[in-house]
Amino acid sequence: MEKRYQQLFKGKRIDFPLATGAASHVSLTYDEKKNPYLLCWTYIYQEKPEFTVPLKGCRIINNITEIGPCIHIITSNEEYQFQCRSKEEFDEMSQFFNMLGYPILGFKNVYVLNKKIGKGSFSTAYIGTNILYGNRVVVKEVDKSKVKESNVYTEIEVLRKVMHKYIIKLISAYEQEGFVYLVLEYLKGGELFEYLNNNGPYTEQVAKKAMKRVLIALEALHSNGVVHRDLKMENLMLENPNDPSSLKIIDFGLASFLNSPSMNMRCGSPGYVAPEILKCASYGTKVDIFSLGVILFNILCGYPPFRGNNVKEIFKKNMRCHISFNTKHWINKSESVKEIILWMCCKNPDDRCTALQALGHQWFLPKLTDMHMTANINELKRNEAIVHKSNDQQDMCKKCKHFNNTQNDDIYNNNNNNNQLDPNKNHKNNYNDYKNYFDTMLKIDDKYSENLIKDKTSMDSISLNKKDYDAYLVHSNEHDTVVLHGKCQTTKNSSSLLSYKCSRRSPPQN
């Protein structure tokens, strides 16, 4: 039987898929200068290749994924990772590239280990340097004899499946000389635990930004069926040493997919573990929310909610789930942050919020004060403006509709009221009033304004009323958009939240 490399040298197509799934077959060809190219096909009988990979001047590296060994080709413009399904297939393809004059590089041909920074039960962590480019990385070294216990292949799978800006990036993974190496991005800011020890508690505003990042990352993990299971201060790192809110989630050594048998395992760190894990009950993604609630408590006051003289005492308090705010550290903290901590740390997981529900809590909604609102409310007088769906800020203002004698809590979407606010016609003053009003709201947070312009955000219809009006700008964390929300006082004792996307469930009390 012909070897795979023999088939390639005869111009035949062989199955050699890209790890991304963008191509399934390759063949070999040469240009007029005899430079070799790989032609990449999505299926074997395709007439024209999807794309070509120039091999002249490339580097070829031996990587691994959770499936097995792979061949990583780095050209001057792109990188391509081809998946091998067995060691025999990898050996054959390695021979092919060697015969072409492109030997396979291993981990030690690409990286050098500089400094040991940590050691766990199954792995050792180093700061390393990429020899080819000079950039710093973090390398996690796992002895192959401990691969099963270390969960390293699940860690690789999780980091490849859920690539997110608030989760540490897996650059590559290798097998060489009895070890598995994970090459990860280097985060300059250090551990959250160290930062808190050196600098003291966070302000509530900084904590809010930090928690939003982590919740967004957790939502990405949970929506992909992944549970971290060991969220703690040491497993959050600062991306930027000058920005304490720039947190990223690291260390997926205990992570699991929801449908995995490993979800029966009892795991976590004392003081951070959800009570359902301690009770040996079934559990899901909400164990991460509990752990993050503990972290939020900790970064605001400088000490954990479940303290004890020994591990047994900590676990006992951890199981009981009683959280107290009766110290001087909590005197000036808002009621809403205490409320969200209690919601995140509910003993019963059915009463505990999800990541998405937490992001919708009022603590994350920046509120306009009377100082921001008074002038514009007076300008609006008896008039109300309606924001209708549009593609960007300019277009949105042009499509703004104007009404008289409307009810405070109505959302208008009917076709009977269609007087356009045209800045060049009779409604010029109303148009300018509204535009100034909206500009004022955008100034609450520069990030929201930037996202609106950059992302050409569409807006939900909403009534803007002068009477007892609270306005909010909310960052929609799923899609990086901006959503405008308003609350109108309809009677003395009630109000209506005028938005399709911001109905909020009141968290239960423990």
From Swiss-Prot:
EC number: 2.7.11.1
Disulfide bonds: none
GO CC, one annotated term: membrane
Pfam families referenced in this protein's UniProt entry, alphabetically: Pkinase (PF00069)
Molecular function (Gene Ontology), one example: ATP binding
Location of the active site: D230
InterPro entries: CDPK_Ser/Thr_kinases (IPR050205), Kinase-like_dom_sf (IPR011009), Prot_kinase_dom (IPR000719), Protein_kinase_ATP_BS (IPR017441), Ser/Thr_kinase_AS (IPR008271)
Highest taxon in the source lineage: Eukaryota
Signal peptide extent: none
Locations listed in the record: Membrane
Ranges for domain Protein kinase: 111-364
Keyword Repressor on entry: no
Alphabetic keyword roster: ATP-binding, Kinase, Membrane, Nucleotide-binding, Serine/threonine-protein kinase, Transferase
Protein name: Probable serine/threonine-protein kinase 2
Region (Disordered), start-end ranges: 408-428
Entry-linked SUPFAM superfamilies: Protein kinase-like (PK-like)
Catalysis: reaction(s): L-seryl-[protein] + ATP = O-phospho-L-seryl-[protein] + ADP + H(+); L-threonyl-[protein] + ATP = O-phospho-L-threonyl-[protein] + ADP + H(+)
Family statement drawn from the similarity comment of this UniProt entry: Belongs to the protein kinase superfamily. Ser/Thr protein kinase family.
Positions with a binding annotation for ATP: I117, G118, K119, G120, S121, F122, S123, T124, A125, K140
